[in-house]
Amino acid sequence: PMVTGDIKDGSLGFDYKWNMGWMHDFLEYVKRDPYFRKYNHNRLTFGMTYAYSEKFILVLSHDEVVHLKCSMLGKMPGEYEDKFANLKVAYTFMMGHPGKKLLFMGQDFGQWSEWSEKRSLDWYLLGEPEHKGLWAYFKALLHIYRKYPACYALDQYPEGFFWINADDGDRSIYSFVRCSEDGKDNLLFVCNFTPVARPDYMVGVPQAGKYTLILDSSMKGQHIYTAVHTECDRQPYAVKYPLPAYGTAVFKFSKHTAKATKKAKKHK
């Protein structure tokens, strides 16, 4: 504790702290067979109980892809294609979660081998469709992160995040909202960590109106959905969306009823 706070308050005064607890829970969850993930559902929700105690970096460093720990792609369960789908949904959850991000080189396109300082990355893998697809998807995630301040502006403030459904362990689906400072272009994230498609999936939303799908795991482009007045996930409205196996969805919307009112303070 007190690593990144103000020195006047007895803190060490660092800008950020690696969130090793989150890293451990995250990796323990994503490497499990999807059938057993429902028994470990709280591993991905627990981090929010202390997310504002420090200024955190969500870190997947070189130390997690060496010494027989496997690369990120190698950690994923399932057959060949399942591993890529698992990694996409894992990275989506990570990019939506409060905290700055650190991902070691080569993990964005699915390096198979562990990292070694004695050789270069396996760039030739980008010539294979699955690796190129993973790289393109991660690039799209980075584009969203850079374009929409909701992803980062209120990282250190509770006003910047709220769960839609943190308790859907039986289906291993997580949904949450990242809020902007002015209530514009808030982002709704949905992550399905199982190989089970949910064609009639409904996610609760805080208000009526349009919800624009700006990214999903199929990479089919934007689509606008209209919320219906049906209570879902303890929210007054809902959006129906055909959630694929290992599916992800990121929607943008504005002026939600619980928009952030507290401005982020400048770090001194």
Regions found by a protein language model. Name each.
Residues 1-77, 81-84, 88-89, 96:
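Glycan-recognition surfaces
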Residues 37-39, 63, 68-69, 78-103, ...:
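Carbohydrate-interacting/catalytic domains
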